Amino acid sequence: YDDGQCSSYDLEACWWSNIPDADFYWQDNYDWVIGEFVCTGFDYLGEPTPFSQKARSSYFGIVDLCGIPKDRFYLYRSHWRPDTTTVYVLPHWNWPDRVGKEVPVFVYTILETIILQSHQRLLSHREFPYRKAV
């Protein structure tokens, strides 16, 4: 992005990579895919990708430089830890620039059904039949 920030929605990838959802789709749907390799578990100093200037580190990690899980951490957790109930909603609720506007909402979970409500009003109801909660 022009402002030097990366989106937590994980909709972009470098030319030599792909978004996590693509990996998970292939793992779930193709018998010949036996796993994945995550090159960057933690952000690190150097190789300022996806930016080439005015950046100090890589931004691809699942965990930031301080060891704090990023939003995508919960996406991986929902796939890698089916024995642990994960429900993670992003973005945060107090986005001042978006008051009164439509905001994309992502939910990372192992659950088969998700219902989003605001002030007892149904916003969305999604079923994920391919998910098998443990």
Q: In which residue ranges do the predicted regions lie?
A:
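Extended substrate-binding grooves/exosites of carbohydrate-active enzymes
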Residues: Y1-P129, V134
